[in-house]
């Protein structure tokens, strides 16, 4: 699946579209796991996928789970094999790739069959030997400089398998003279998933007041439960809405987007009493209206607040995964939400992967592509997920220069025209019937 600045995944219920986001969360969860021996951390805070048999297609334990990830680094990475200036540089470049395969039919549980890192025109692979599940070979291929791993003198000890399906074992570094750079590959992989942030579709109810310990959260929480904490932690920071525009306080940026969505006239978070550490989120829905708490207005405001906050709070260049960001919003606000996504993607360089059911959000996104000044079709990837015979199928939607979808799937966003035609047919039938009586 090719991802753009904004990647939208649409589809029917239970078609498998959420699985795409879940797998990225699974890899992040595995990276953060404390058990170095685990291949995939299938159950944790981010996702709960059960056992390997639950996660594999049709529960077929003879199948393997394999994946391939490729992304462009912001800065070129140059690997160094050793401190000697005469040593061959293993690889360099901006194009970074990673592949792995995990099988679940081992007696000891899921095991990683291989991991492979790629940088530029070089590849470094740790792969299970054919004779023994616990012994692995470390090898390299390069079309540039012919780099190869050099063993230390002495007995050739076997190399154990990967750690957490992405990291090389310590022996891969100690058994070779020129393999210290493997840590740089692992660190690049870890940095990628450290920069992945997630907001789920089920968000917390708003509260009448919030206790803030004056700490800085990593994000807004998977249910948006730390959105107010994030706003308070960033309140002394500034952001701007576009290149060359005036910087505004972080809280003002949040208020701006809530107003653009047509949900409020003003928004602020203030302490109940000095040094109380208890804060209240207050809004004014219309100019001249009374100021009320977040709990006393429409539910949609509290549900979209974490979306806006997360997109403005995460570091520039982050990857944000969103499930149904439009939930509980009326159609006009759903349309305007597309502008929130576009600003974060194009101005803050946040890569957004979202799962949505909103035709209104999609229509605004298409409109902005047609206008061409805020986002182009080259920056957007759209996919449709369906499971006509119980097996998920992902179709890439063809978008032209003006945002028009060339291969619009049947019943992509329901059958609005069919409903109108059926209603008109029923209306005529009843009118004829009433006249004949």
Regions found by a protein language model. Name each.
Residues 26-38, 315-316, 345-346, 372-373:
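Post-Walker A helix-loop "phosphate-sensing" segment adjacent to the P-loop in P-loop NTPases
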Residues 31-304, 310, 315, 400-437:
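Phosphate-coordinating catalytic segments in nucleotide- and nucleic-acid-processing enzymes
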Residues 336-437:
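C-terminal lobe/lid and adjacent interdomain/linker elements of RecA-like ASCE P-loop ATPase modules
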């Amino acid at each position: 699946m090719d991802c753009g600045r904004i990647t939208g995944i649409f589809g029917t219920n239970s078609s498998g579209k959420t699985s795409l986001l879940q797998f990225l969360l699974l890899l992040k969860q595995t990276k953060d796991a404390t058990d170095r021996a685990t291949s995939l951390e299938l159950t944790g805070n981010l996702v709960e996928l059960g056992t390997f048999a639950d996660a594999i297609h049709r529960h077929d334990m003879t199948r393997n789970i394999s994946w391939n990830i490729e992304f462009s680094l912001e800065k070129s990475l140059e690997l160094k094999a050793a401190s000697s200036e005469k040593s061959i540089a293993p690889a360099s470049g901006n194009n970074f790739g990673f592949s792995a395969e995990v099988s679940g039919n081992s007696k000891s549980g899921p095991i990683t069959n291989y991991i492979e890192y790629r940088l530029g025109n070089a590849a470094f692979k740790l792969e299970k030997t054919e004779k023994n599940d616990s012994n692995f070979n470390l090898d390299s291929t390069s079309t540039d400089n012919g780099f190869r791993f050099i063993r230390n003198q002495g007995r050739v000890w076997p190399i154990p398998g990967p750690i957490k399906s992405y990291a090389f074992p310590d022996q891969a570094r100690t058994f070779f003279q020129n393999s210290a750079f493997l840590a740089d590959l692992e660190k690049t992989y870890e940095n990628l998933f450290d920069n992945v942030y997630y907001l789920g579709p089920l968000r917390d109810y708003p509260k009448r007041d919030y206790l803030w310990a004056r700490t800085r959260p990593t994000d807004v929480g998977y249910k948006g439960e730390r959105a107010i904490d994030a706003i308070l932690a960033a309140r002394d920071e500034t952001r701007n809405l576009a290149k060359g525009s005036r910087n505004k306080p972080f809280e003002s940026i949040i208020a701006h987007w809530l107003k653009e969505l047509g949900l409020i006239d003003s928004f602020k978070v203030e302490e109940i009493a000095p040094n109380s550490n208890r804060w209240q989120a207050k809004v004014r829905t219309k100019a001249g209206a009374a100021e009320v708490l977040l709990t006393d207005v429409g539910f949609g405001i509290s549900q979209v607040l974490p979306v806006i906050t997360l997109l403005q709070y995460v570091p520039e260049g982050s990857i944000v995964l969103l499930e149904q960001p439009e939930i509980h919003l009326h159609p006009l606000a759903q349309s305007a939400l597309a502008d929130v996504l576009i600003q974060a993607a194009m101005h803050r360089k946040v890569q957004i992967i979202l799962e949505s059911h909103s035709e209104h959000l999609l229509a605004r996104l298409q409109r902005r592509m047609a206008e061409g000044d805020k986002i182009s079709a080259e920056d957007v990837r759209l996919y449709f997920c369906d499971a006509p015979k119980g097996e998920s199928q992902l179709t890439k939607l063809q978008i032209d220069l003006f945002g028009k979808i060339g291969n619009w799937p049947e019943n992509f966003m329901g059958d609005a025209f069919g409903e109108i035609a059926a209603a008109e047919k029923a209306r005529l039938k009843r009118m004829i019937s009433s006249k004949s009586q």
